[in-house]
Structure formats: structure tokens, C-alpha cells
Amino acid sequence: MLSTFVQGFFLSAAMILPLGPQNAFVMQQGSRRQFHLMSATLCAISDGFLIGVGVFGGSALLSQSTLLLQFVTWGGVAFLFWYGWGALRVVLFANVELAQVNNSVKNRWRVVAIIFAVTWLNPHVYLDTIVVLGSIGGQLSSDLRPWFTFGAASASVSWFFSLSLLAAWFSPVLSKPLSQRIINGFICIIMWYIAWQLAKQGLLISD
């Protein structure tokens, strides 16, 4: 059981560690100390739920549904381009945009909406949690699947809270206007690069 837990933990960690929309948003909220723990919690809960769905039968369904993959992929492309544009505006028009961003992210429900968007409109999340982890965990016996799921979900919890708290710890430096411009420039590049990759994948799916 312990070995299955450890297997789930490290496989999940390998999926989560590469910087993507979820990690970028949690880091950004941590640098501003605005709902950063809530952001980490919701990301971890979402990942845990999707991992469970994949391990207990959802992997085959998503793999076979071309229409669902198309919907998630192009929805993700549109959102990532929009989010990247918002980050670029902070870089180009720092004073005005930072003031607007600071006001908008103080709205709890707006933050919740963005968290769900970077999670549920990100096809990589589905591929990592449901398809990859789900297919591996789904091959285990019924008594070991909960341990694999618990281990994988624990990695998600550990990572998102560590990232959030670390960013909050360095908030005095990261919250400065120059730092925010650098962070947002980095986020813009990440979002648009992922959107470009997803668009290429979407065209392949349509074929």
C-alpha cells in the first residue's frame, strides 16, 4: 500500500511540476498575497477530483471522446490567449493596469472563476490527471486504487501550497511594480506558448 501511495505521489509530482497556467496563477496570487491559499486549495481539490475520476473509470471515456477533446482544447486556447493578453497589458501599461488588476483580484469570485478556468479549460490538466494518471492507476487492483489516488492527490496539495506560501514569503520583493512586470511578462509568454501548442494539437484532433 505504501509503495502504491509513493508511486502515485511521484508520478503526480512529475505531471504537476512543469510550469503551466495553474502554477503561474497560484504563484501570481501568492506574490500579491491575495487569496493565495484559497487558490492553492481549489487547484488541489480540482486535481484530486480529476485524478479520482481518471483512476476509477474516466480515462477511457475522455480518450475516446474526440468532440469533448476538441471543446476543451479550443476553449483552452481562447482563454489562454485572453489571459496572456491581460498579462501583457500589465507589462506595457504597468501603472494603470496594475491598479486595475489589484482591484479586480480583490474580488473573491473573480479569482474563483479564473482558477476554474485555468484548471477546467486546460486540456493538459485532463491529459495529465485523467488520461495519464488515470490509465496507470486504473490498472491497479480495486484495493490499491484509493492509495494511488491519495498519493497522487497528496502531491498536488503539497506542490500548490508550497508554491503559494513560497511566493507569499517573497511577496515584499515580488509585489514591486518592476517585479510584477517581469512576472506578467513571463506569464504572457507561458500562456501564449501553451495556447499555440494547444492550437496545433486541436488541428491534429480535427484531422
Swiss-Prot record:
Entry protein name: Arginine exporter protein ArgO
Q: Which UniProt keywords apply?
A: Amino-acid transport, Cell inner membrane, Cell membrane, Membrane, Transmembrane, Transmembrane helix, Transport
Which is one GO molecular function term here? L-arginine transmembrane transporter activity
The protein's location, in the record's own words, is: Cell inner membrane
Give the matching PANTHER family.
ARGININE EXPORTER PROTEIN ARGO, ARGININE EXPORTER PROTEIN ARGO-RELATED
Catalyzed reactions per annotation: L-arginine(in) = L-arginine(out)
Q: Does the keyword Transmembrane helix apply?
A: yes
* Keyword Zinc-finger attributed: no
Top-level lineage group: Bacteria
Give GO cellular component annotations, separated by semicolons. Answer: plasma membrane
Transmembrane portions of the chain: 1-21, 42-62, 67-87, 111-131, 150-170, 185-205
Bilayer topology annotation? Multi-pass membrane protein
HAMAP family, A to Z: ArgO
What family does the entry list? Answer: Belongs to the LysE/ArgO transporter (TC 2.A.75) family.
Q: What function does the entry list?
A: Involved in the export of arginine. Important to control the intracellular level of arginine and the correct balance between arginine and lysine.
Q: Which InterPro entries would you find in this protein's record?
A: Arg_export_ArgO_enterobac, LeuE-type
Task: Please give the positions of the paired cysteines in each disulfide bond.
Answer: none
